[in-house]
From Swiss-Prot:
<dbReference type="InterPro" id="IPR013785">
    <property type="entry name" value="Aldolase_TIM"/>
</dbReference>
<keyword id="KW-0456">Lyase</keyword>
<dbReference type="GO" id="GO:0000162">
    <property type="term" value="P:L-tryptophan biosynthetic process"/>
</dbReference>
<dbReference type="InterPro" id="IPR013798">
    <property type="entry name" value="Indole-3-glycerol_P_synth_dom"/>
</dbReference>
<dbReference type="InterPro" id="IPR011060">
    <property type="entry name" value="RibuloseP-bd_barrel"/>
</dbReference>
<keyword id="KW-0822">Tryptophan biosynthesis</keyword>
<dbReference type="InterPro" id="IPR001468">
    <property type="entry name" value="Indole-3-GlycerolPSynthase_CS"/>
</dbReference>
<dbReference type="GO" id="GO:0004640">
    <property type="term" value="F:phosphoribosylanthranilate isomerase activity"/>
</dbReference>
<dbReference type="GO" id="GO:0004425">
    <property type="term" value="F:indole-3-glycerol-phosphate synthase activity"/>
</dbReference>
<protein>
    <recommendedName>
        <fullName>Indole-3-glycerol phosphate synthase</fullName>
        <ecNumber>4.1.1.48</ecNumber>
    </recommendedName>
</protein>
<comment type="similarity">
    <text>Belongs to the TrpC family.</text>
</comment>
<comment type="pathway">
    <text>Amino-acid biosynthesis; L-tryptophan biosynthesis; L-tryptophan from chorismate: step 4/5.</text>
</comment>
<keyword id="KW-0057">Aromatic amino acid biosynthesis</keyword>
<keyword id="KW-0210">Decarboxylase</keyword>
<dbReference type="InterPro" id="IPR045186">
    <property type="entry name" value="Indole-3-glycerol_P_synth"/>
</dbReference>
<dbReference type="Pfam" id="PF00218">
    <property type="entry name" value="IGPS"/>
</dbReference>
<keyword id="KW-0028">Amino-acid biosynthesis</keyword>
Length: 256
């Protein structure tokens, strides 16, 4: 069984638990009192000063295990803000990434930068939960959704004020994202089936992303040379997690 299949199987169980919290009903009751979401899409637009950084706050991963033993999401977010991050990505998957929706809430309440909820969204209840807990944007992974779900979830997210980053890994997934009107497309250099990495994935797919769609390169960026390649390919932003922890070189870059 692939990594993605295992994750989605577990996610089905989590969604069953979430149903008992009735997030759709809670959203209907509370929507009038919720603060407006911050402009995640606008934060990623290049202004001629280089790539924008989505800095990922991640405790662990299936491929590497525990990454940050003394994990403090607020302190990590503060450091990334000082580096010049344009937005945050917070892992909320519990089982495989040791994440928590509480981490998202902590970061969202503590800082003004927009926050992306990084998880495996497979049900409408997760979208309502995201809005209720302070996310400004969500990730939709094309490989985890059928075409109807992708279109429906894009519309639902927009209706509750959430921005959406749609993640793809190959040309077929990219075409599906474009067909459904994805406003931001993230090319994941990591294959979610086996978690292998190839930076070439971003470089090969970039020419097929329309000019009016924001393009993000995700995962596997480990050096200033990698960043230069992505910038030359005319991406708007990068999403970096482990690299900011493990590469002193990336930690010294001052992002625009």
């Amino acid at each position: 069984m692939s990594y993605l299949s295992r994750i989605l199987e577990e996610k089905e169980r989590e969604v069953g638990e979430l149903a008992s919290e009735h997030p759709a009903r809670r959203y209907a009751e509370l929507q009038g009192s919720l603060a407006p979401t911050r402009d995640f899409t606008g934060a990623l637009r290049r202004t001629g000063r280089g790539l924008r950084l989505i800095a990922e706050i991640k405790k662990a991963s299936p491929s590497r295990g525990l990454i940050v033993p003394d994990f403090d999401p607020v302190n990590i977010a503060r450091r990334y803000g000082e580096l010049g991050a344009a937005a945050y990505s917070v892992l909320t998957d519990r089982t495989f990434f040791q994440g928590s929706i509480d981490y998202l809430q902590m970061v969202s309440r503590s800082f003004q930068l927009p926050v992306l909820r990084k998880d495996f969204i497979i049900d409408e209840s997760q979208i309502f939960q995201s809005r209720l807990t302070g996310a400004d944007a969500i990730l939709l992974i094309v490989a985890a959704l059928d075409s109807c779900q992708l279109g429906d979830y894009l519309q639902l997210a927009a209706s509750v004020g959430l921005h959406v980053l749609v993640e793809v890994h190959d040309r077929k997934e990219l075409d599906r994202a474009i067909e459904k009107g994805a406003p931001i497309i993230g090319v994941n250099n990591r294959d979610l089936k086996d978690f292998s990495l190839k930076l070439e994935t971003s470089l090969s797919l970039r020419p097929f992303i329309p000019s009016d769609v924001l393009a993000v390169s995700e995962s596997g960026l480990k050096s200033s040379a990698d960043i230069a390649l992505i910038e030359q390919a005319s991406f708007d932003a990068v999403l970096i997690g482990e690299g900011l922890y493990t590469s002193p070189e990336l930690g010294r870059i001052t992002w625009s």
